[in-house]
Amino acid sequence: MVQSTRRLIIKSAAATVGAMSIAPSLFAQSGPVRVGYAIARTGPWTGGAQVSQEPNYLLWAEQQNAMGGISVKGVKRPIELISYDDRSDIETCVRTYEKLMGSDKVDLVLPPWGSNANFAVAPLANRYQYPFLAPTALSKKLVEMRLPYFFLLLQQPAPMTTALVDMLKASGAKTLACIYVDDLFGLENYAALKV
């Protein structure tokens, strides 16, 4: 647990530094760094999004602001989070990210929760040239898209499920039952498990 937390902190710090090096609009301003995202606060994705993702965004902004904000060219700037409820709906999620990157013109974006939402939004991040680091998406299809502004942070289905099957076999398991969600994440993991 400590090792994964340490890795997450290191990845987050690297992502922030990388994003800041790519986002020139940050250097042209002196006000707050405007960071936008859409996340499920209602609907079926809420459980995952509100446990594994949005609390981390809020904690990051709170802790950075407590230290004076993000240092941009030696000047500390506070973080201003601009967030919306994507209502666990792909169309709402896509429209919201178009607004954040297109008309709101936030300095940085944080990704939505889940493989499906990231799959839908990743091409937008590429079009608007916003670095997009996805901590809650895994999909071979996302890898195959080869989007230069989109970065997956999770292991992909085949290596994960192979390790799971090996562990279960080593512990003497003979049968495995699997319940999965009928979406990109569930289908790809189940397909990898069947191989």
Listing of model-derived features with the role each one plays in the protein:
Residues 1-17:
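N-terminal secretory signal peptides and thylakoid transit peptides that target proteins
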Residues 24-38:
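C-terminal segment of N-terminal export signals and the immediately downstream linker at the start
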Residues 36-60, 84-90, 113-116, 181-187:
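Extracytoplasmic "Venus flytrap"
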Residues 39-42, 60-68, 101-104, 113, ...:
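Sec/Tat-exported extracytoplasmic proteins
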Residues 46-50, 93-94, 121-122, 144:
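Short, solvent-exposed loop/turn and secondary-structure capping segments
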Residues 55, 106-195:
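Extracytoplasmic ligand/sensor domains, especially the bilobed periplasmic-binding protein
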Residues 55-80:
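Signal peptide-proximal N-terminal region
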Residues 87-105, 167:
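Short, well-structured alpha-helical segments in soluble
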